[in-house]
């Protein structure tokens, strides 16, 4: 009996201790949950929730102050759509505990400086805005906020800095004024007028060469595509004219005015913006996306005008929701649809415009394209009675404006629309788009419909497309995705290499070895054997043609069959692709046999790069070759090129990462050696690591050289074909601005935009070798616009 009691005590002891040690963690988790979820669905009002939470936090401050500070600083960055809820909470805590309010303000300033140094400028904007709203909650004194704004605007006077640095500090000030402008003007109107005058002077002298490369549409009608600072400035000017009155910001602190106005306020410490360094990377400028106005939503609430600050506030809050919840499409969709004050605005129109604005954002969308697709599908499920109609209206608008739409954005529109249709049984009223049938096939509308059908086929099958799209569209139907094996028909028996192709077919079917295959191929005569060029003698195009055509036709049943064939006969491919011409000819043959199946071409080229049968430069040269001129404007061609560039970039990054890791290992080894003076072996251990670092350094330099060469090849080819077009038009008295020219020039822009961070490294080389002052201004302007993105 006593033994059992003793056992019970032993069991209870450790369990009791574990519970005690876990209690603080449980309380911290509970505090985090309470803070993060305040203002969400609740039976009681937001005000009573805030008051209750302030009481709970005040009681926990003695034991959990640092944790509460961390959580509040974190939500200021990560949940900006609930900013005014959290500023009110901080205001209530400051009214109850002045010291805590001071510590919170100090912590926020520290976070702001760290965030700027880390180049996290989007989050830094939220922190600035949060500090501004604390002025409304009587936590921060208005004069010290004005002083911070003065230091921000002072950046515009700095010398030898990129314009994008000044842009960000001006944006941080202007974008905060909808929340705090009224309060600051009441307290410091003279100083605020001076700040706005400085901003106006800065905006007038800014260069805006970058605008056209970032616009979704080249036409200014029906909606101007304004530069973001110009648009925001117009909105703030109108807000000032309206005496800083706005009607869309949730301001829960107004309910606590009698409590908050009694609180003591804190002065912000003098703020010096962190200086510009070589490592500073500022946000790229933007163009404001406009798709709808009040005429597009005739029923229900009126959509605010483009220069109304309410339009900015609504869009900014919706962007914040997307940033906070993009990883969870269901949560994100629900949050968007439960937007506060949603009954006062045409919410569905705002949501669709904001989502398309992000999807079409140049240089790149904030998130993966597929995120926006799945989010719109989720929104349609949650609002089946209204949102699909708005989305159909938007699709129709986008289609009607294809002639002036940027080619990069047309690509994204194709991807989204085809993916969206695949989730709704490919239902669409194709007759509404029959106007494209009377246009030349190289025009944007027929090209768009053709590419959409091609993409839809990838997501279903060929016959399905023929069944759902009217026969009137047959000229735009995708080709039947079958291979074209020229040695498969006896009527072609007179073709050179035909008999070898038959023998090769039988040998592969009978599982012949590589040696046996080589023996069959050696009998193929070389059409280049009379050439004087040594490389011409070793390069046999007919041998490549017979082998690649035969093998790929036998493996044509599926992607996996083709992949297996490449793997099984990899050594033969490597032997045939020893020369640059050999690599290029393999790609030509892949195109010849699979010209009716663009997706197969794309996956085979991808696999050949991965298995080093061909290299990235060969793919670039092939894409610009005369054999592909017919398909040059096609979507899949650029899909292949960008995939090739990404592979090269990832290869370089992988080796750079290996080098950095190795250097860290060596540094740790040195640190360990310094702390252990008696270790005589440590010096000997450095040797192998240093040798590995040296080898990796050489690999990095070699990979970067390949990367630079790839971009040089691509840009050189662009310059050549664009120059040929311009000369041809000039000598023939033809208008330069053809559909082909628009497409090609915008594809050049796409290379710059999609890979801008990598290309920045090679700017000097590009400027010295290719984009020189002598180049035609039609081409040179694209390079200058790109340079302006970070200047």
From Swiss-Prot:
InterPro entries: ARM-type_fold, CBP80, MIF4G-like_typ-1, MIF4G-like_typ-2, MIF4G-like_typ-3. The keyword Nucleotide-binding does not apply. One of its GO terms (biological process) is regulatory ncRNA-mediated gene silencing. It holds the Pfam family MIF4G_like. Residues 28-240 form the MIF4G domain. One of its GO terms (cellular component) is nucleus. SMART domains: MIF4G. Keywords: Coiled coil, Cytoplasm, mRNA capping, mRNA processing, mRNA splicing, mRNA transport, Nonsense-mediated mRNA decay, Nucleus, RNA-mediated gene silencing, Translation regulation, Transport. It is found in: Nucleus; Cytoplasm. SUPFAM superfamilies: ARM repeat. One of its GO terms (molecular function) is RNA cap binding. Residues 1-24, 668-687 are annotated as: Disordered. Residues 641-714 form a coiled coil. Residues 1-14 have a biased composition (Basic and acidic residues). Belongs to the NCBP1 family. Component of the cap-binding complex (CBC), which binds cotranscriptionally to the 5'-cap of pre-mRNAs and is involved in various processes such as pre-mRNA splicing, translation regulation, nonsense-mediated mRNA decay, RNA-mediated gene silencing (RNAi) by microRNAs (miRNAs) and mRNA export. The CBC complex is involved in mRNA export from the nucleus, leading to the recruitment of the mRNA export machinery to the 5'-end of mRNA and to mRNA export in a 5' to 3' direction through the nuclear pore. Component of the nuclear cap-binding complex (CBC), a heterodimer composed of ncbp1/cbp80 and ncbp2/cbp20 that interacts with m7GpppG-capped RNA. Component of an alternative nuclear cap-binding complex (CBC) composed of ncbp1/cbp80 and ncbp3. This is Nuclear cap-binding protein subunit 1. The gene is ncbp1.
